[in-house]
């Protein structure tokens, strides 16, 4: 079986799924102490980089997603599937797990 090379441009979410580039978590506290990886909170904010075609309705039509590529979003803490491409962190999640568009 041939190896598959993954990059952001080759990831196409299906249905109502959204591919989000995770914003970097805080490296140090307000007091200046550096946090080890085990003490960092899981990020909940990121930028939408790819969208699925939308959820299919009962009549066969597609329901357009509310978010767009480039939107900065806040999502549920433990939602989706974490994906690492190179050094970048991403999460693949359903649109229902997005809580808000921010900024």
Swiss-Prot record:
One GO MF term: protein-folding chaperone binding
Main localization of the protein described in the UniProt heading: cytoplasm
Subcellular localization, as worded in the UniProt entry: Cytoplasm
Coiled coil feature spans: none
Single GO cellular component term: cytoplasm
GO terms of biological process kind: chaperone cofactor-dependent protein refolding
CDD domains reported in the protein's UniProt record: cpn10
Keywords attached to this entry: Chaperone, Cytoplasm
Quaternary structure note: Heptamer of 7 subunits arranged in a ring. Interacts with the chaperonin GroEL.
HAMAP family in alphabetical order: CH10
General function of this protein: Together with the chaperonin GroEL, plays an essential role in assisting protein folding. The GroEL-GroES system forms a nano-cage that allows encapsulation of the non-native substrate proteins and provides a physical environment optimized to promote and accelerate protein folding. GroES binds to the apical surface of the GroEL ring, thereby capping the opening of the GroEL channel.
Similarity remark: Belongs to the GroES chaperonin family.
The name this protein goes by in its record: Co-chaperonin GroES
Gene for this chain: groES
